[in-house]
C-alpha cells in the first residue's frame, strides 16, 4: 500500500502543536515523523541539529556558521535543550503508539560541507576531520536511536538522512572560505563509504536518503545499503527517471516528493498523474506503486500551520488514490 509522510520541517515554534498535527494526519495509514521547527532559531536548523548529535565533537555558532570548537558553548547547549524538549514532547504525543515513526538527521556530507574547522575552512577539505565527523555522527545516531526506543517503545523507527549538500560535494562546486576557489570534489566511492557507515549505525531499521536536487547521484546511493531514496520528482527529467527505474528494480523503494508546497488547493489527480505517467514511461509496473511513499516536494517550514496541514493532508489523499491506481 502506498502511504504518505513528510520531509520533516514544520512552521512555527510550538513543537507540541506540530506533533499533534502530524499524528492526527498520518498515524492512521501514513508514516508520522518528529517535526523540525527551524523558526525557533539556531540549534533548530538542519546543521545545528545535526551537529548536536555528534558524539565527542563540540560545535558552536560563529559568524560564518557552525564551527568545531574545543568545548561546547551557549549555542551548543541551546541545541541540546531544544532536542530534549522535542524528545519529551514526542514521548507524550506518541504515548502508547505502535507503528512506524520517522526521525531525520543531517547526512555526513551535508554536515562536512557546512561545519567549519578552527582554521576557517569547511570540514570536508580535511580527510581526517571528515573521517572523525562521520564516525562521530554514526555513534551519535546509535545513541539517539537507543534513547528514542526507550521513549516510544512501540515505535519502529525509520531514519531519514538528509543530504542536500551531497551533489555539491561530488561536483566540486563548494566555494572555499575566500570565495575565490572551489573545494576539490569528493570521490564517489569515498562518499558512498561515508554514507554507508552512518546507515549501518541505524542497524536493521528502515533508512531513506533524502536529496532534493535535480541531479541526485542514484547509482552512488544504491551502493550505500540504504533502503529507499527520497526525491523531488518535479525536478527529474527523462534520464533521471531511467536511473529511478534502475533504483527501484534494484530493490530500493521510492519516496516521491509530489506535492508542491504551494499546492494547498490542488486536486489529487494533479498530484499523482505526472508520477504515474513517468512511472509508466520507464516501464515500471503499476503494481510497484505500492512501494512508493508520497511526500511534499520539500519541507513545510515556510508555510503557515494551516497551509502545512493542507499540503500534508493532500499527500495522504494522494497516497490513497495511488494505492487504487496500483491495483487497477
Q: Where are these predicted regions, by residue range?
A:
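A short acidic, amphipathic alpha-helical/loop segment
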Residues: 21-22, 218-221, 239-247
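A cross-family glycoside hydrolase active-site/sugar-binding cleft signature
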Residues: 34-37, 102-106, 160-162, 208-212, ...
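Structured alpha-helical segments in the cores of large, soluble enzyme domains
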Residues: 90-93, 144-148, 191-201, 240-245, ...
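Catalytic-face loop-and-helix region of soluble metabolic enzyme cores
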Residues: 227-328
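Glycine-rich anion/phosphate-binding loops
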Residues: 75-92, 131-146, 269-275
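Active-site-proximal beta-alpha loop/turn segments in soluble metabolic enzymes
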Residues: 118-133, 160-184, 257-264, 295-304
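Active-site loop segments of alpha/beta catalytic cores
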Residues: 136, 140-236
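Alpha/beta catalytic barrel-like cores
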Residues: 1-130, 220-227, 252, 290, ...
